[in-house]
Design a protein with these regions (language model features):
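Surface-exposed amphipathic alpha-helical tracts and adjacent flexible/coil segments at the periphery
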Residues: 2-31, 35-46, 60-61, 67-95, ...
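A short acidic, glycine-rich active-site loop
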Residues: 49
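Glycine-rich, highly charged phosphate/nucleotide-binding loops
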Residues: 52-57
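A cross-family signal for key residues in well-ordered alpha-helices
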Residues: 111
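Ser/Thr-centric signal marking residues that sit
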Residues: 125-129
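Conserved nucleotide-cofactor-binding alpha/beta core module
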Residues: 133-134
Length: 738
């Protein structure tokens, strides 16, 4: 197969455009996209886009390759056990047809594709929340050739990843910004069952919320505090090049031709100017034109030069401002018919008694076709002008005849049908030859399917354990007094940077003095500043007697393999193990225990391999983790860890904690999940480790919850007390997501 790739060097860019339909696909190619990312009939993160049928996707592959462009297919959702078995069969025809790369979120999907198609390029989706060099090194062994950076990364962070790993980088340059780190959002999922991890986000972040302080006093009314402006990076080409970013990604698979092709055309203009060394100052007129194609309360340059900021937030109703109808119509007329046809040259030779000869060529490919034998004319001989007129026709092919040479012996004849057939066969053969280098004829050897993770099968079966994760130090005392808790997980979020080492040591010793195992829960997001500091302190923390670590992202997984190898490495629920393939893949990375994803329902959990899984029985689900800060954006940053609330239009209040040590916000569900009454069901499903997550609870509340668990665990209680009525949720256990 032809390597339809590129040389990743500074000052070289790929302009990557979205397309939600074949018509938009052809338009963005015409507008100058180097590559196009599309969703097929299954497994894409834009379930409500038109998307491509299998036949349309095959046509798109041919169309792109004829013009020397690339196609990336999105398989960037989380797949359940019932679905992952289909993914390789789904990809097979596109793989054989020359698919350039596949974009993935699910670690199980990633490893399954790499095992089945080892020569297919894999790009990690922004849904994998890649923020550091550690993840790049981890993924490099799985066929990953490119990482789509989390939108929150600065240009300096991207530069460091590129320089330290050599991994090809893709960054968003234009379009909508999510409030939450992509892949970490359960807001839409928990409120209405429409999961962003399944391509069905309902965007509750675009709704108004009142902001309340820690004592539930309202201080900001009906503000769009979770709604970010659209980003535009057209003025940052120099910075992106200096950072080593190769692929510039435009968001918008739900957009139509005027927006998609229009935005591509303006970026194409300034990329070409930049690459040619000319002046790249974006004119005010062009910037206004891009703005007029669509924006949400104006533009922001995103996180390239900042960690967060109130100027990125709309605060007012995030409607798109009025667009320029005349400009949109002009773009539609220019690009709706697709790219200009490919110029070809032809040579036709007609000699009596010999087979008709026709040669057609582009700049790089040439084909020769022989037709029927040329006859002596009985009546009207062929005229060069008539033959030329007929042979120059290219119809609905992608070609246009640029030059045609005709050599006709006097007095010869060939039926018009024979000439037409010669022309059609030649152009069809030319197209076939142009596409042949991209296609894969070989069929990779299928690997034997492994029903369960072999790395797990070899492990000694452990007794049941009950973990308590303490998000505040005040919760530790009742946890230590609980007879049911066997293991305590001290969350790094509960400690300030200045005192963490002393307080962690004190708390770890207190846990071990109670003959309980002590574990460390690492931060939810692991950016460069955090990584440098944590790398320094982690060996000392390990020596405090920690039995293992709870990791929440791929960067921490890679780091834990270095520091905690030989100890327990537990992945949190947001390192998603929707399917057994993911369980096996993580086990291969040294993971000893995974947390059951929060979006699986009862039947899906039962069909899952659970022998090495932990189930969260109690806790406030984190709905969003954001680099933004509700407190800082509404009251100013005071660098103090605290609690506030968001109140929606139904008067429901969602707690928000700001973690200043790591500079991120976590928005929690309004009610905690409570699954104590289902304990025996989980045991029958093979789960032996259970967990309670404490976030904002007081010591008294923590003690009451632990007592309630003990009563269910010893069989003395079968129903929840009346005072718990309407104070908890079952999460997705009884409903699940689409």
């Amino acid at each position: 197969m032809k390597e339809n790739n590129h040389t990743t060097q500074q000052n070289t860019f790929e302009l990557l455009a979205p397309a939600g339909s074949l018509a938009i696909f052809k338009a963005v190619v015409a507008a100058g996209a180097d590559a196009v990312y599309v969703g097929g009939s299954k497994f894409g993160a834009r379930a409500y886009a038109d998307n491509f049928s299998d036949e349309e996707l095959l046509e798109a592959l041919d169309y792109a390759h004829l013009y020397g462009r690339r196609v990336y297919l999105t398989v960037n959702t989380l797949l359940k056990n019932s679905e992952i078995e289909q993914v390789c069969a789904y990809l097979q025809p596109f793989y054989e047809h020359g698919l350039d790369a596949v974009l993935v979120q699910d670690f199980g999907v990633l490893t399954a594709i790499h095992e089945r198609f080892p020569d297919l390029a894999i790009h990690t989706s922004t849904q994998m929340t890649v923020t550091g060099v550690e993840a790049a090194r981890l993924f490099s062994g799985y066929g990953v050739t490119r990482m789509v950076m989390a939108r929150e990364l600065s240009l300096n962070e991207m530069k460091r990843i590129r320089e330290e790993t050599g991994m090809e980088l893709e960054a968003f340059v234009h379009g909508a910004l999510c409030y939450c780190y992509s892949g970490q959002c359960l807001f839409s999922s928990m409120l209405g069952g429409r999961s962003g991890n399944r391509g069905r986000c309902a965007q509750p972040c675009r709704l108004p919320y009142a902001v309340l302080d820690e004592k539930h006093r309202e201080y900001k009314k009906d503000a769009y505090v979770l709604s970010l402006k659209d980003m535009c990076g057209i003025k940052d080409l120099r910075g992106l090049a200096d950072a080593g970013v190769y692929s510039l990604k435009i968001e918008g698979r739900m957009k139509q031709i005027p927006y998609a092709a229009g935005v591509v055309s303006y970026y194409r203009k300034y990329i070409d100017l930049f690459l040619s060394g000319q002046e790249t100052q974006v004119s005010e007129g062009d910037y206004r034109a891009v703005l007029a194609l669509g924006n949400r309360c104006g533009f922001t340059d995103g996180y390239y030069h900042r960690h967060n900021g109130s100027d990125m937030v709309t605060f007012t109703k995030p409607n798109y401002e009025k667009t320029n109808e005349a400009l949109q119509q002009q773009i539609l007329r220019t690009y709706e018919n697709g790219a200009a046809k490919i110029p070809v040259r032809g040579e036709l030779v007609l000699h009596q008694g010999q087979a008709a000869y026709y040669r057609v060529k582009t700049q790089t490919v040439s084909v020769e076709i022989s037709g029927m034998e040329v006859m002596q004319a009985q009546k009207k001989p062929l005229l060069a002008e008539d033959v030329k007129s007929r042979m120059e026709k290219t119809g609905d092919t992608p070609f246009v005849m640029e030059e045609l040479s005709i050599k006709i012996e006097d007095g010869v004849f060939l039926p018009n049908g024979a000439l037409n057939q010669l022309r059609r066969e030649a152009l069809a053969e030319l197209q076939k030859e142009m596409l042949k280098p991209y296609q894969r004829q070989e069929h990779p050897q299928r690997k034997a399917e492994k029903k369960f993770p072999e790395a797990c099968e070899k492990r000694e079966k452990r007794k049941e354990r009950v973990f308590a994760v303490t998000g505040e130090r005040r919760q530790l005392a009742p946890v230590l007094e609980s007879s049911c808790v066997t293991s305590v997980c001290l969350d790094m979020e509960a400690y300030d940077r200045s005192t963490i080492m002393e307080e962690l040591k004190e708390d770890a010793n207190a846990v071990m003095q109670k003959d309980k195992e002590v574990y460390l829960a690492m931060p939810r997001i692991f950016r460069a500043g955090t990584a440098e500091w944590v790398r320094q302190i982690l060996p000392d923390i390990k020596r405090m007697g920690f039995a293992g670590v709870l990791v929440r992202n791929y960067e921490e997984l890679a780091l834990a393999k270095e520091t905690f190898w030989g100890s327990e490495i537990i992945t949190d629920h947001n390192l998603y193990c929707y399917n057994d393939q993911a369980v096996r893949a993580f086990a291969g990375q040294g993971v000893t225990k995974n947390t059951v994803p929060l979006e699986l329902n009862r039947s899906e959990i039962k069909r899952r391999y659970n022998e090495e899984s932990m189930m969260m029985l109690y806790g406030y689900y984190p709905l969003m983790t954001s680099a933004q800060c509700v407190h800082a954006n509404t009251r100013g940053c005071d660098k103090k860890r605290g609690l506030s609330y968001l109140k929606d239009r139904y008067q429901v209040q969602f707690p928000v904690k700001n973690f200043c040590t790591y500079c991120y916000n976590v928005v929690y569900n309004s009610l905690p999940v409570l699954l104590f009454s289902n304990l025996e069901e989980f045991k029958k499903a093979g789960i032996r480790d259970f967990r309670m997550d404490f976030t904002m609870e007081s010591a008294k509340e923590t003690k009451a919850i632990l007592k309630l668990y003990e009563e269910f665990a010893d069989g003395s209680r079968r129903q929840y007390p009346k005072e718990w009525e309407n104070r908890y949720t079952n999460g997705h256990y009884k409903r699940g997501v689409e």
